[in-house]
């Protein structure tokens, strides 16, 4: 039986997914992106940033993740992909911390495995204890995990992620901000995961102009 917290968080994720497929911001006509106003400054000078906004509880993010991984392998040299975990409620903040903790511990390989754990294996990774136990089962030192999870660095990155989501006017996941000027998503691309990445490619070209 699912715990009340587990059910509540999955319900929140489902709501976020519904929001994606009925976004508050609508593209005009056949346009498959919206302008970000005001534009977002880049954290990587000389590069075109592609920000992927995601939530581990989002089933659409889980579905598109392998495609994003493949896309990143062939991205142009002047493009940098940054994945940005966001929270639609306070209960999802630990999942933001989980992402940045795994990055700090140099275990980016566990990123797709978190999606599998939550959506396929139905693991309740919604608090530090459960996350720490799962990470330890994947070969992560538990003491280091606990220390980094609550570190100032991780807290700062979580805060920055929330600021980026607000600046890009993200109201559903997954979504992509390109060059700080444009935002697209599967819904804007016709409810098409692959189509969204094609739009990202087009926006990269547009960002160079």
Curated annotation (Swiss-Prot):
- The identity of this protein, by name, is Thiol:disulfide interchange protein DsbA
Which PROSITE patterns does the record associate with it?
A: THIOREDOXIN_1, THIOREDOXIN_2
For this chain, the family text in UniProt reads: Belongs to the thioredoxin family. DsbA subfamily.
Instruction: Name the job this protein performs.
Output: Involved in disulfide-bond formation. Acts by transferring its disulfide bond to other proteins.
Q: Where is the signal peptide?
A: 1-27
Q: Which gene encodes it?
A: dsbA
**Sample GO molecular function, one term:** disulfide oxidoreductase activity
Organism per entry = Bordetella parapertussis (strain 12822 / ATCC BAA-587 / NCTC 13253)
Where the record annotates domain Thioredoxin, the positions are 28-166
Q: Which domain of life is it from?
A: Bacteria
- Classification via InterPro entries: DSBA-like_thioredoxin_dom, DsbA/DsbL, Thiol_disulfide_DsbA, Thioredoxin-like_sf, Thioredoxin_CS, Thioredoxin_domain
């Amino acid at each position: 039986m699912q715990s009340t917290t587990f059910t509540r968080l999955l319900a929140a994720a489902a709501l976020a997914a519904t929001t994606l497929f009925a976004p508050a911001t609508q593209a005009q006509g056949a346009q498959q992106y919206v302008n970000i106003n005001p534009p977002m400054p880049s954290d990587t000078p000389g590069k075109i940033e592609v920000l992927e906004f995601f939530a581990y509880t989002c089933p659409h993010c889980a579905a598109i993740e392998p495609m994003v991984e493949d896309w990143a392998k062939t991205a142009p040299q002047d493009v940098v992909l940054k994945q940005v975990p966001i929270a639609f409620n306070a209960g999802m903040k630990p999942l933001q911390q989980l992402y940045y903790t795994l990055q700090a511990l140099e275990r980016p390989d566990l990123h797709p495995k978190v999606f599998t754990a939550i959506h396929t294996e139905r693991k309740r990774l919604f608090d530090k204890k459960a996350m720490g136990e799962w990470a330890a089962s994947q070969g992560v030192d538990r003491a280091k995990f606990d220390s980094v999870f609550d570190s100032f660095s991780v807290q700062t990155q979580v805060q920055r992620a929330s600021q980026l989501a607000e600046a890009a006017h993200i109201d559903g996941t997954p979504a992509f901000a390109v060059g700080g000027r444009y935002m697209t998503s599967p819904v804007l691309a016709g409810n098409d995961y692959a189509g969204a990445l094609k739009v990202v490619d087009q926006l990269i070209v547009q960002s160079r102009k």
